Amino acid sequence: MRKLAFFLFVVSLALFRGQAHAQRCLPGMKGIRLTAGMADGFYSPSSKNETSYSFGASLATYTKGGNQWVFGAEYLRRYHPYRENRIPVEQFTGGGGFFCNVLSDGSKTFFLSAGVSALAGYETVNGGKKLLSDGSTIRNQDGFVYGGAITLQAETYLSDRLVLLLYGRERCLWGGSTGHFHVQYGVGLKIMMD
């Protein structure tokens, strides 16, 4: 009976001592990233004709030191006010970049990374329609865009397979006719794979 009580005591100590963390950010580990964010300002009901949003999906592959290569695609939609209406500008981009681990805690739960990416894609203004409902003509052209982005991202592990992302990003794209720079910020989830 004493052996059983001692065994249960040791097991309970092991269970309530704390959670054991799996090894994280090892070279070759991969994760699927899903992100959503805002661009070029904050949303408010008074500025709904000028807001923009983005969605993205990418694959992150870790290298030594918690650094990572990220390759993926992103959709960004920005509205430009026009009288009582708004004109949508959409960018479909693909890109790849390298993120360098800047800061992490000892338990490998929190990471701060800085990254540089190359981007290329297509920009369309008002869905390719040149004529507006009031008879005006849009002069901006649809076309291919190219450029890059710098990113600052924070990651925190919610579990061994689920990571919460917070990011800020500055995109600079040439080739489009609606502006070069777009500031983005948002949240995302990374699902770690074996």
Task: Show which residues each predicted segment covers.
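Gram-negative (and chloroplast) outer-membrane scaffold detector with strong preference
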Residues: 58-133, 162, 191-194
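Residues that define the transmembrane beta-barrel architecture of outer-membrane proteins
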Residues: 28-32, 49-55, 88-94, 110, ...
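Residue-level detection of beta-strand scaffold positions
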Residues: 35, 52-54, 70-74, 95-98, ...
